[in-house]
């Protein structure tokens, strides 16, 4: 596999990282490969500056086999089949222990030779359903609906069965036998739900994975002290109505242990049934998977000792090359032996808040006691260096300082402490920003990158491999829990470009916008990472808004706010930015603003009540929220939103004057914890109105309220003033 280019900036170039990375030649390399390696000039080697006495962290526990996309889908499907059989009280008691069956058949070329082959139930199911996906929107890259054909049509589709038979190299008759014996009754159940499959899943703030119990069954060794992959709710509230009343008419799912009122179910039950009862979420499957968190707080020396034991447990006595470690890692990930899960620990996304625990780079807030004299002078130089990751997001020509606040994980570095084969799964950076990852010490980290040119093909490949999973978890690739080997033959077959990097101590990896990346650690190492922006990132930032709406992924900052801040700064001092960049911001803002304004005018013709919110925020409060999110698509409501009443009989219990004094956090909590109201962005509100008008039972929307988060008058004024200055 081709490696990404390594760059060797001069000392002067290294002191101006934004300008250096904006160089057209560097940009072309970044766009082509997705990321580049930056090796600092000789003499740059900042000491690891961590408060060893007080720095602790809780690592994630990773089960490598369950991170593989195909493995996980196969196990999910087996669980779903078993839950279905339990729910219908199948007299056959055919509870599956493995996600496959072994078939025997004669070789077509050598009749005397008997072939044995594993056929995975999910593989058959996914081939049968993948051609039935329908687009809910022509702009969507992820398909959001799945329509199940009538089973008689499915059984009679000879062309489909021939295609599957050819793909698996298994006779059609055997495949049909597998379908009828293991899958058909479950398929009929899903067909009965048809396009409402997604509505059968119960929204749950703390979902449980179907694989949780399996993972809990494995002994993780003497170093294990695992927590849960989801937070426990503080009460026994019904998953549907969120109320804790009527315990005698509350039933627990025998798969996930979640409580439900029997009258909140669809259809409702008259009484609590005897025997096993399984909720629809556990039968259909929610596709959720999360890491288990270790409850033990590790110090750095303690984790290093764990890493030594891990190396002894997993590695031979001789030293392995990077290529051998790489082959071993992907072998562990892609194997499917449920009796021997390989578990590793990864100190990921560590964001402590005290001096000496936030970053491994030198800072003025934490100076080790043993540093003095000339060492102190050098130490302070590193404190102020632009490639100190505490400074990079705020470096000259970066845009993130315009927010005038810290964004955890983006403008404040997060620490990553690896152990052998701990992994970071395929993902892009938030809002397609650039990122810088620096290794302070330890064993190499292996990276893989898929540049922007391969993103669509990569998305299509994953959707093809798991057609139902991306419907249940549309933001799956933002969850950092999914791997597929870049050496999988499907990568080459799909024409997906993929590159590799081996990062060693005192080296930076820079990821460019819209680059998928993943990788693993070859042993103990200490890294940290932060995000930053460059002028050419701007269109990617706007593109992320559209893409995130489709996958219901929340943005971490408001692009409209960023553009407003750029124009406001330029309006006060035209020398702060070059005119070409400001014109780009100006045109992007005009397009966004005019589109939003048209929607607002349509809503004002329907919704008579409008209010301008006056919300005060504290930039020094790290838990402060700055943006109001749409309940439906999770986009930021940059200019306006509608408070939609879902329960008209009780809505008047809400006092209008009280809502005017809610904080942004309270607004967001209102829409997530109270089923009576929703916060809708202007686009989703107009869609909901259209659906009401097209339905037979039209409901009134006279009580809905339009709220402005910004003054249209102020925005108009700023646009006019900047327009005049740009035209000079």
Swiss-Prot record:
Binds 1 Fe(2+) ion per subunit. The keyword RNA-binding does not apply. It is an enzyme of class 1 (oxidoreductase). Keywords: Chromatin regulator, Dioxygenase, Iron, Metal-binding, Nucleus, Oxidoreductase, Zinc, Zinc-finger. GO terms for biological process: antisense RNA transcript catabolic process; chromatin remodeling; mitotic cell cycle; negative regulation of transcription by RNA polymerase II; positive regulation of transcription by RNA polymerase II; rDNA heterochromatin formation; regulation of chromatin organization; regulation of chromosome condensation. Its cofactor is Fe(2+). Its EC number is 1.14.11.67. One of its GO terms (cellular component) is nucleus. GO terms for molecular function: histone H3K4 demethylase activity; histone H3K4me/H3K4me2/H3K4me3 demethylase activity; zinc ion binding. Its main location: nucleus. A zinc finger (PHD-type) spans 235-285. It catalyses: N(6),N(6),N(6)-trimethyl-L-lysyl(4)-[histone H3] + 3 2-oxoglutarate + 3 O2 = L-lysyl(4)-[histone H3] + 3 formaldehyde + 3 succinate + 3 CO2. SUPFAM superfamilies: Clavaminate synthase-like, FYVE/PHD zinc finger. Gene3D superfamilies: Cupin (2.60.120.650), Zinc/RING finger domain, C3HC4 (zinc finger) (3.30.40.10). Fe cation binds at residues 427, 430, 517. It is found in: Nucleus. Pfam families: JmjC, JmjN, PHD. Residues 381-549 form the JmjC domain. InterPro entries: JmjC_dom, JmjN, Zinc_finger_PHD-type_CS, Znf_FYVE_PHD, Znf_PHD, Znf_PHD-finger, Znf_RING/FYVE/PHD. The JmjC domain is required for enzymatic activity. Belongs to the JARID1 histone demethylase family. Histone demethylase that demethylates 'Lys-4' of histone H3, thereby playing a central role in histone code. Demethylates trimethylated H3 'Lys-4'. Present with 290 molecules/cell in log phase SD medium. This is Histone demethylase JHD2. It comes from Saccharomyces cerevisiae (strain ATCC 204508 / S288c) (Baker's yeast). The lineage of its organism: Eukaryota, Fungi, Dikarya, Ascomycota, Saccharomycotina. The gene is JHD2.
